[in-house]
Amino acid sequence: MPILLLKTLRDLRHRTLRSILTLFGIAIGVAGIVAISYTARNLAVAQTAVYADASQADLNIGTGDISPTIRNVLERLPNVALVEGRVVYYTRASLDPAAARWPDLRLTGIADFNAVQINRIELLAGRYPEAGEIAIDASARSLIPAEIGDIVYTRSRVGDRPLARRVVGFTRTPAAIDASILNQAFAYAPIADVRKEANLTGDNRLLFRLEAPDEAGTTASRISRILGTRGIPIGFVIVRDPENAEGRRELATLLQLLTAFSILGGVLSGFLVSNTISAIMAEEMRQVGIMKSLGAGRLRLIRTYLLPALLLGGAGTALGLPLGVLGGGALGTFLANLLGLRLPPPNLAPREPLLALTVGVGVPVVAAAIPAWRGAGTPVSGLVRSYGVAAARGRRFLDRLLRPVGRLSALGLMALRAVGRRPARSGVTILVIAISAAAFLATQTLDASVRGTVDNLYGIYAADAFYSVGRTVTPRYATDLSQLPDVARAEAWSRTAGFVGPLNVDVWGVPSDTELYRYRLLAGRWYSGQPREVVVSADHARRDSITVDQLLQVDIGDQRRPFTVVGIVDDESTYLGSVASGKLFMTVEDVSRLTYYGDGANLFALSLTRHDPAGVDEALARIELATRDVLPGTFAAYADKESTLQAVRVLTLLLRAMVTIVGIVGAAGSANTLILNVTERRREIGILRAIGAGRGHLLRLLLAEGLALGLLGLAVGSVLGYLLARALVDLTGASLFRLDFLLTPAIAASTAILAIILSIIASVGPGLLAAHLRPIEALRYE
């Protein structure tokens, strides 16, 4: 075995704990990068497969009751390759007919499960349902914990007689967000059963496959006109868009954030290697001096001390690559299940090993080159000179600055002076701690900003619930609802989907004198009630460069009408997976003219006397029972907010996992530095023990050093964390919705506590090492 390799292995074995900490940091950095790359690549493949799958609908149109005859007419239109009908009915389900809470259920009726060609579902267990039976999406078991053979009861409203169905299978709905996030279960039943329950004779959902998907907008307009001329209302039109698929932007944001933190982990591992090489060279200064005096050049010396970095990097890569692939597989499976995607079989693309080598070997070698170059360039006289223990108090500005500390605590003064003994090493350690603290502060700020923004956005809507009717009523029905004991105020609203050019928009009909929509004007004014006035949400105004007084062509169904933009409001609240580019607000009458509701109303916003979730649920149950003659349906506003917060919790969970890893690497870096300090100061420690310093004194000394490093790292990390938090909030806001930056004193305090705790924990090991060092061994060193 070459002598240089033997020397390197001896050096690494000589300081086993230090080498293990460095190896651990490299492996974690490699694993993080590989896991994110593996996850992102496989999820991209899964999303591409879903989009490329001929099963997916190019157009998804929600309609009123539509007969098979009209469906046949639509199938003969140009560019239409295939049309299939469904019945989608929103109801509630429970395993107990006497249960107090019934989760929301989207029940889809299919005519022939074995002949489905569009939006095919996958049968995971059991069989497809027949009359009186139901198949439940597997993700819905988090809301409805059913097993095959169980009886599931469904009812649309309080007071209805529950319908019993036997569970005969479990399915998987491709590209559907997990039921636990949406707080809505999915299930399938024979179309005849669902029609009967929904009181329909035909279908209410049309799925289209097109010959030229890029002409979907034109085809959708043609279909809307045909349905409009027949008086069939259109609830929404969804054009399949690979760049704006359901959940795509949320996933992209998550992966971007995870990538940022995995890069931080890789950078920290580089710092660990740099510290290790610096320590090896510091321990072997005399040997380096002798080699230089015998004619060894700088490059030869650098090669000598780059080999430990290569060995540590290679070993870290060997450990981190499989760990990253396993972690990426687990993370990918978790995210794929949330998004209804099927991952490809386990695989390894060239980019994962390349990334592993770059982070595991490239970063350590570059990090090691700096101390190696600096050490190899030191003059021989400086390398062979032996240092002693001398009184240097008062000789430097730092000593004079720290003199008050010495009056309070001699140990505290020694700890602070020890931090300044190796400025480069201490600086790197402080930076490692700072990055860890910054990562924690940034993620906590991002979480608080998202939650605070969600609270503010949903605070715009003062309605506690939305109330829909199955029979035609007039807007004056709001007065009847206001007379109910549980209702403080009721307003007739409306909601539908539309287009502004190629962009999907949510269209809201809201009274001009509303009290249940607390609009926040950014420009212009709220509409006065005059026809053809519209207020646009800020996100849509930005995307389409809309300004006040601009004329906007709005398409709803087969109707196109020009509207004058009179205002822009701050309202970017949206449901998870929404493909709408923003919101339009106009009078209820304008929406009715465009949707054939005439003088009828189908949606009411309710402010209730109680606002807590339990009180809202109880009030809605009583309201449904009191107004069952109009076939009401209710939706609690808190449920939509809870769905959004559930998605935020997933984001927060994964980010905190990454920050935990970064924090562990940071603690390892701090421990590494303290171990190096103990190693270099063995003679000093021996002298302290010889003159009477006890083990407790030495332990407190190392704890004080660690605390000093932690506090300095916290100071730097607070600044870096603020900048990083700003960047993360801006990045997330650009991908999802605009976020309000929220950095609270509690976040700053928790960051400080975490930095101090990690510093103390990292100091315990080196402190015990110093405390158990025998004086005779320390003074005999070298």
What are these regions (language model features)?
Residues I36-S37, L77, E84-E130, A164-T173, ...:
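The feature marks short, hydrophobic/small-residue-biased sequence motifs that occur predominantly
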Residues A46, R222, I226-L264, I280-A282, ...:
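Peri-transmembrane interface segments
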Residues G270, S274-I277, R286, L311-L341, ...:
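Small-residue-rich transmembrane alpha-helices
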Residues D53-A54, Y128-P129, P174-A212, I460-A462, ...:
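Small-residue transmembrane helix packing/gating motifs
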